[in-house]
A protein has these predicted regions:
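Active-site loop immediately N-terminal to the catalytic Tyr-X3-Lys motif
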Residues: 21, 70-74
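Active-site helix of classical SDR
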Residues: 43, 79
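Active-site-adjacent segment of SDR/Rossmann-fold oxidoreductases
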Residues: 68, 89-100
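Residue(s) in the substrate-gating loop at a strand-loop-helix junction
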Residues: 63
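C-terminal helical subdomain
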Residues: 103, 121-157
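Conserved NAD(P)H cofactor-binding loop of Rossmann-fold oxidoreductase domains
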Residues: 11-16
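Substrate-binding pocket helix/loop in short-chain dehydrogenase/reductase
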Residues: 19-20, 27-32
Length: 182
């Protein structure tokens, strides 16, 4: 077709706030297919041409959920941890070859994600999509392999490094329990 992708942005994804067994396997299949499979396939298809030209890049939208287990978002958080780890691995694998990889990890962003996720968003702070996109592009241009948008999000990503994962999981479960239907 003669098309060339200079920068691939894998931004599509969805999640659900629910008790694990309250969602269908079909929902989880769709989530994993979009959040992981589509991202891998698009990256696999676009990167060879970037390597051939000696330049290009991939921005994969992960999440602040990538950094710790998230009760009531177990499958979503696991899928975003996959995105983060894949992206950082590819950044290391292709370093110095002209193709740059960035995992963009936003927190709550004012999109339709939360309504699709069935989340109770009362009192939650949100960034605008424009703020997240600008921060992501700046991180990409500056050669970062991971960018966490927002100071509070960055600090929360450090919790699993200073506290045990069990403690972090208990804290997160307490924070999010009232955000899902019983």
């Amino acid at each position: 077709m003669g098309l060339r992708v200079d920068v691939l942005v894998n931004n599509a994804g969805f999640g659900k706030w629910a008790h694990f067994l309250n969602e269908s396997l079909d929902t989880y299949d769709q989530m994993l297919s979009l959040n992981m499979d589509a991202l891998v396939k698009l990256t696999y298809l676009c990167v060879p041409d970037m390597l051939a030209y000696g330049k290009g890049g991939v921005i994969n939208v992960a999440s602040t959920a990538s950094f710790q287990p998230i009760p009531y978002q177990a499958v979503y958080a696991a899928s975003k941890a996959f995105v983060l780890n894949l992206t950082e691995a590819l950044a290391g694998e292709y370093r110095g070859r002209g193709v740059h990889f960035l995992a963009l990890c936003p927190g709550n962003t004012a999109t339709n994600f939360m309504s699709t996720a069935n989340a109770n968003t009362t009192g939650m702070p949100f960034s605008t999509p424009e703020e997240v996109a600008e921060a992501g592009l700046n991180a990409f241009v500056n050669g970062k392999s991971c960018h966490i948008h927002g100071r509070a999000n960055y600090l929360s990503s450090l919790l699993p490094r200073v506290l045990s994962r069990a403690v972090v999981t208990k804290i997160v479960a307490g924070m999010f329990k009232n955000r899902v239907a019983p």
